[in-house]
Amino acid sequence: MLLQAFIFLLAGFAAKISALMTNETSDRPLVHFTPNKGWMNDPNGLWYDAKEGKWHLYFQYNPNDTVWGLPLFW
């Protein structure tokens, strides 16, 4: 009985790991926000709009370089 529970638990973990490994952008974090390209400053201004049912996250962003510099966008 204990062995069956362990195998069931192990199969569940294997399925989750498999799903994570099939991520098309495996070199990017799966939990933390990152821009598609460029540099971003620390995120701030996270808020939930209950009317729209959406989360909003604000950060400084430079799409043209991987370091801080102008132009910066919000």
Swiss-Prot record:
Entry-listed glycosylation sites: N23, N64
Gene coding for it: SUC3
Disulfide bond positions: none
EC number(s) stated in the UniProt entry for this protein: 3.2.1.26
UniProt entry tagged with the keyword Hydrolase: yes
Catalytic activity: Hydrolysis of terminal non-reducing beta-D-fructofuranoside residues in beta-D-fructofuranosides
Family note: Belongs to the glycosyl hydrolase 32 family.
Binding-site positions, substrate: W39, M40, N41, D42, Q60
Enzyme class: hydrolase
Active site: D42
Pfam families documented for this protein: Glyco_hydro_32N
Identification of the protein by name: Invertase 3
Gene Ontology molecular function, alphabetical: beta-fructofuranosidase activity; sucrose alpha-glucosidase activity
Stretch forming the signal peptide: 1-19
Keywords: Glycoprotein, Glycosidase, Hydrolase, Signal
